[in-house]
Amino acid sequence: MSATKLTRREQRAQAQHFIDTLEGSAFPNSKRIYITATQPGVRVPMREIQLSPTLIGGSKEQPQYEENEAIPVYDTSGPYGDPQIAINVQQGLAKLRQPWIDARGDTEELTVRSSDYTKARLADDGLDELRFSGVLTPKRAKAGRRVTQLHYARQGIITPEMEFIAIRENMGRERIRSEVLRHQHPGMSFGARLPENITAEFVRDEVAAGRAIIPANINHPESEPMIIGRNFLVKVNANIGNSAVTSSIEEEVEKLVWSTRWGADTVMDLSTGRYIHETREWILRNSPVPIGTVPIYQALEKVNGIAEDLTWEVFRDTLLEQAEQGVDYFTIHAGVLLRYVPMTAKRLTGIVSRGGSIMAKWCLSHHQENFLYQHFREICEICAAYDVSLSLGDGLRPGSIQDANDEAQFAELHTLGELTKIAWEYDVQVMIEGPGHVPMQMIRRNMTEELEHCHEAPFYTLGPLTTDIAPGYDHFTSGIGAAMIGWFGCAMLCYVTPKEHLGLPNKEDVKQGLITYKIAAHAADLAKGHPGAQIRDNAMSKARFEFRWEDQFNLALDPFTARAYHDETLPQESGKVAHFCSMCGPKFCSMKISQEVRDYAAAQTIEVGMADMSENFRARGGEIYLRKEEA
């Protein structure tokens, strides 16, 4: 943690400098590779970690080495991870999916924006300095057409997005030849079906069944296709966004790029402060990952923060505004029903979801049913026209472990299952949001309830936090629950940062939250038995046993921290080749001793073998050649 706290002016200047000097860059000793597909224009980016060779013998003067294979890994950084690509935040990213969208012939450009709010913002000359200069002309489905990946999947169509995902999910493991690296323990998948090889047809089938979603708004062509579903790699979401008291457009774009660098599969923009519309445009035009929002936050800003003044018309206009900007998924709190609100009265911590509390207050003040529930079919019609996925929000999630798994939480979950089937009628993709604060012994029930009542739609949870006693360390308390529920079948984990319950996260907090959750997601993939998940672990263990320090750093989720911790006590270059670390020193290193034991055992085997051969030679009378019948 920095000893000197930066002023707001300094924070903005630092963020601006980051944006102005941004270049594509790879992690240490890594390079960007692309795997091509059968469909034209499908090139899937991955990061390949280059490893040093293993010393296997020879002399000091003429050592003998054995090459180690490069390790391919999933890469969320988009163009920011490719040193060959010129980055210009002012222009935004290349529109990767635009040719695929255009080739389908089922969309049309809008001559005028559908949202009154968007029209007003575009007409305001005072916003010119804040506005992203290359605003896209939005597209919408042609009349009578649906443009969702779910619709295509149900029609039996394998889209370029699906083929891209199939290659990406396999993580290039077909390139690995070493049996040591390919070894993997059997997993326990709790009913998930994990194929040995993920094909584009498998992706299509999972999407068609509603078990997976591909968040890919037709107005966000910059995004690289990814999938959320329990039969795929567990994904991680990072939250960013300004508030009424802090953060700027520059800082939010910086956090976006930073998030994708550290492994965010999706990013949610939860801005609640000024210039929400403009901030979101900058984020979308520069995001290689899907972007989600909670539209009720901006709708509330439009009525000056007074929940009672919210209307369906204001909310509908907000949906159109965001859909035409390119938001890939909406969190909609349509399951907070009027009759469920009294169920929270005896809770220790009441309703802790911002969206849930807004809708609960509206329901009570008007004594009417939630207008999101009442107008849900109209919401689905909007989503179907742009391919916006729905993330059905858990507005009644528990905010403390005392309130976990209560009547209100599961009543809402069952309603979300009802809404899922309605959304599917419109070919709208759906995932379900989950808690929250849940002690370990109560976590699995959340997964089984969701699978049963929400028809196996992907589950997306915030943690859950497994204890409430650790403010400042809630990335740990929730990472434990995240690993567990990911193992049980949760498809995406929403990260928690060290600032949870305390304040708005900065760059370092974002990184800490993401690393914690990438660990949780990877641990879940290992436990489920996702094919190829153990390759990187095996490569790390091999490098560790062989004292290949540089490879250990480079294989780490965070190479920079691994190197820094090592160099705190052994900063010299000789420390990078030493057969010990500062924990045990040269005399007590268990791995060094293990190597010596292995070498000794091998030598003993040779010596015993030679003795046996000598005895056998003497027993045959010392003859060099044997007759054929004796051989």
UniProtKB/Swiss-Prot annotation:
Reactions that this protein is recorded to catalyse: 5-amino-1-(5-phospho-beta-D-ribosyl)imidazole + S-adenosyl-L-methionine = 4-amino-2-methyl-5-(phosphooxymethyl)pyrimidine + CO + 5'-deoxyadenosine + formate + L-methionine + 3 H(+)
Binding site for [4Fe-4S] cluster: C581, C584, C589
Listed EC numbers: 4.1.99.17
Binding site residues for Zn(2+): H437, H501
Pathway: Cofactor biosynthesis; thiamine diphosphate biosynthesis
Residues that hold substrate according to the record: N239, M268, Y297, H333, S353, R354, G355, D394, G395, L396, R397, E433, Y460
Keyword terms, alphabetized: 4Fe-4S, Iron, Iron-sulfur, Lyase, Metal-binding, S-adenosyl-L-methionine, Thiamine biosynthesis, Zinc
Cofactor(s), names only, from the UniProt record: [4Fe-4S] cluster
GO biological process assignments: thiamine biosynthetic process; thiamine diphosphate biosynthetic process
Enzyme's top EC category: lyase
Entry superkingdom: Bacteria
Pfam families recorded: ThiC-associated, ThiC_Rad_SAM
Coiled coil: none
GO molecular function, one term: zinc ion binding
Cofactor: how and how many bound: Binds 1 [4Fe-4S] cluster per subunit. The cluster is coordinated with 3 cysteines and an exchangeable S-adenosyl-L-methionine.
Gene3D superfamilies reported for this sequence: 6.10.250.620, Radical SAM ThiC family, central domain (3.20.20.540)
One GO location term (cellular component): cytosol
Family: Belongs to the ThiC family.
Subunit and interaction comment: Homodimer.
Functional summary from the UniProt entry: Catalyzes the synthesis of the hydroxymethylpyrimidine phosphate (HMP-P) moiety of thiamine from aminoimidazole ribotide (AIR) in a radical S-adenosyl-L-methionine (SAM)-dependent reaction.
Entries under NCBIfam families matching the protein: PRK09284.1, PRK13352.1, thiC
Name this polypeptide is given: Phosphomethylpyrimidine synthase
Organism: Escherichia coli O6:H1 (strain CFT073 / ATCC 700928 / UPEC)
Lineage, highest ranks first: Bacteria, Pseudomonadati, Pseudomonadota, Gammaproteobacteria, Enterobacterales
Gene: thiC
